[in-house]
């Protein structure tokens, strides 16, 4: 549920530091980080917790550190599962703790299309935004998501093999309430 809106050149040129596994974008604020650190019994997360919607991964370091295997092991452990509320995001924050670099929010600008239904909306998507991360139940591939913030997705769709595919119609009461 991410659409590219800007140039990815800086990401293509990105050089990972020694032992750095990923470049990530912070999630929420310090209060949230402290909450996740406490719940996940990982005190270091109090200094930074990332959103897993966007990850620039150093594949060599990822594989060297067996991140995929360790993630699956964590998800099989009932003690960990009882703490996890944000599935892959919680797991990756624990496993990659201290091995990530926090980069600009322009690479994961989160926005819910449903905010458009409010009287006043503060849209963080701007000219600097590289990736729009569509959070919330309405996505730009839904036919009722006819808002300017959907434009980046629609441009990409028009240039894709799916250009002739219809946007999705509402199929349940939750979706109907937003159209």
Q: Residue locations for each model-derived region?
A:
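A glycosyltransferase accessory/donor-loop signature
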Residues: 45-47, 51-179
């Amino acid at each position: 549920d991410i659409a590219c809106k800007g140039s990815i050149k800086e990401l293509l040129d990105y050089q990972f530091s020694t032992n750095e596994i990923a470049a990530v974008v912070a999630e929420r604020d310090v209060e949230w980080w402290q909450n996740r650190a406490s719940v996940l019994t990982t005190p270091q997360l109090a200094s930074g917790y990332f959103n897993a919607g966007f990850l620039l991964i150093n594949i060599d370091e990822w594989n060297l550190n067996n991140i995929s295997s360790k993630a699956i092991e964590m998800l099989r452990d009932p003690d960990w599962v009882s703490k996890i509320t944000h599935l892959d995001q919680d797991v990756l924050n624990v496993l990659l703790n201290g091995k990530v670099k926090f980069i600009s929010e322009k690479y994961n600008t989160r926005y819910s299309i449903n905010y458009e239904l409010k009287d006043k909306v503060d849209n963080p998507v701007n000219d600097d935004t590289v990736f729009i991360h569509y959070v919330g139940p309405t996505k730009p591939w839904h036919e009722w998501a006819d808002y300017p913030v959907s434009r980046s997705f629609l441009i990409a769709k028009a240039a894709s093999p799916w250009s002739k595919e219809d946007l999705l119609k509402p199929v349940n009461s939750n979706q109907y309430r937003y159209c």
